[in-house]
Every structure is written in C-alpha cells, then in structure tokens.
Amino acid sequence: IDGRQLNVTNYVNLLYGDAMSYTIGLAEYEGNTRSFTSTGESIVLDKVEDFQENPIHKNLVLDVGGQKVGYLMYNQFLNEFDDQLIQTFSDFAAEGITDLVLDLRYNGGGSVLTCVYLASMITGQFTGEIFAQQIWNSKLLAYFEALNSNTNDTDDRELNNYFTNTTSEGVTLPALNLSNVYIIATNRSASASELLINGLAPHINVVLIGNTTYGKNVGSITVYDYIDNEGNKNPNHTYAMQPIVLKIANSVGFADYANGLDPDIELRESASNLGVLGSTTEPLLYMALNQITGSGKYLVPQGKVLNPMTDPEFEATNGMHIDLPQNTLKDFLKN
C-alpha cells in the first residue's frame, strides 16, 4: 500500500488512515509455498465519503446440471433497496428457479423488516406465522402486552415479526415457496443475517456453508430528538442514539447464538482459496452447488488457509435495527 509492505501490524494505519487515495500493489498467491509474489502492477483507489453501496451485489440464474439455481449475493439489509430486492425475487420466480444460494458472507446486518421480507420471499407458504420474537425487558414486555390487550390485538405485532405476502406499503411480495435454502456465511455475517438463518430454521431446511457466524442476537432502535408527535425532528440536533434494547428469537424461542451459528459444511474463505464472486468455481458457491446437485465433491484450497485480519470498521457497521411505529415508545415513556 503506497509502496509499503502490508502486514498484520500496519494494515490498520495504511488502510484506515486519513489518506484520500491509495496505490495498491498487486501480487499472486502461491499455494505450495504459501507466499505472495509481486506482479509489478498497481491500481489507484480514491476514497469516497458517504457512498451507499447497492447491497444486491450479484444476482444470477445458474444452469447447474439442468437445474435452475438462483444466486444472490446480498451485502446489507437496507430498506432503501427493498424495491430492487423484490424485483430480484420476481425475476427468480419468472425464471422458475428450483433452488437458491443466498450469499451473506459479507453481510453485517440491517433492517429487521427487510429481513422479514426476504424470508417471506424465500418461502411464501408461511404467511401469518411467526418468523421471529422480540424479547424486551420486563417493563416493555408488560407495556406491549397491555397495549395489545387494550386494542384486542391478538397477534402481538409489537413483539413478533410475521411472515408476510405484502410490504407495509401494500406491495405484493413474490414467493419462491422453497423448502430448502443454501446460505453462505462467515464470521462477518451478523445480526439480521443471523436472524434470517435462525428465523428460517424451524420452517425449512437451511444448509449453512462457510464458517461460524459473528454471534449478534440483539437489536437496536433509533432514538431521535422529536419536537412533536408527528415525527418531526429537532433541526438543531443532528445526532441520534442507537441503543441495543432487545434480543430476537425464532418462532420456537431459540435466541442463544451469541457465539455464532455453526455451519453444516465448514469452508473458510481465505487468500489461499479466493475465486471470482458469482463464478461456479468460486469455492463457497461451488460447495453450495454440489449440495444441490448431490455430487458431494469438495474443492480443497491450495496450501494453508490463512487467518483473516480483523476489520476495525466492521464493529461499527454491523447491526440489526427495528422500525417501531412513531408513537410506540413515546407513549410508553409518558407513562
């Protein structure tokens, strides 16, 4: 990086410093000797602030042994991109896919509501059934239960998340009606990614491929300085709070995955086995496709699997948040 050799002690300063551009030297990895050799080539990357990535990084329909397999690499649960996510599943349904590989290897979480939509589109046969249960502290649990009792609301929507066939705006969700899903996950898969895996598990067969997930089974809400009951924010306050306020369980009450969710098939992503994302020869996707076709073949990475470096930005960006009706907590705080 900028003419300096990257190592485990300097990578944070080199990659996460104040520089607005980087010159990155390229190298090839030699599996037999477990070493890198410079190619003499380099690329220049310019830093862009406030850039919002489209979380739908790859969406493909693969013909694998005569079977149509959908592949979606999804990097964050962002409700701003729900329309694109819905369109992706509409395309999958139109193509008549019979299996789905969902790649969450870099997905640190996001909106619970978007997670519910995704789970509902993967399935479709569980509309109205519980997908996830929110476990709040005793005071808020009592408040929500009393609120539902007073309004004769029997489905506890303040506490539970249900499979649905429409969005909150009334948009119809496409459904694949799958009974199996193959999910690629790593230790960077956190929060809403883990909620999706855990929430689907009691309902369909979830085959988890990769390594143990991050282990974040809690959720947060955004607390603004509202100046009225109409949702208008104080223009003088540009910050908000994001407290962790709840734990989320699946429909059978399981929420104890603070140490992560273990894979059914373990295969670590490493510099020793990197492939092209979306390629059928990329090791993790290759393994998922082999589970679908039943070939059972295994790609052995060349050389030792290298331990990944810790990303100091990941702790700040992974998370799971829920969207409550505007007055729900405000009314509680008045009591």
Go through each PLM region and give its residues:
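C-terminal "post-core" interaction segments
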Residues: G66-L72, Q76-D99, G108-N335
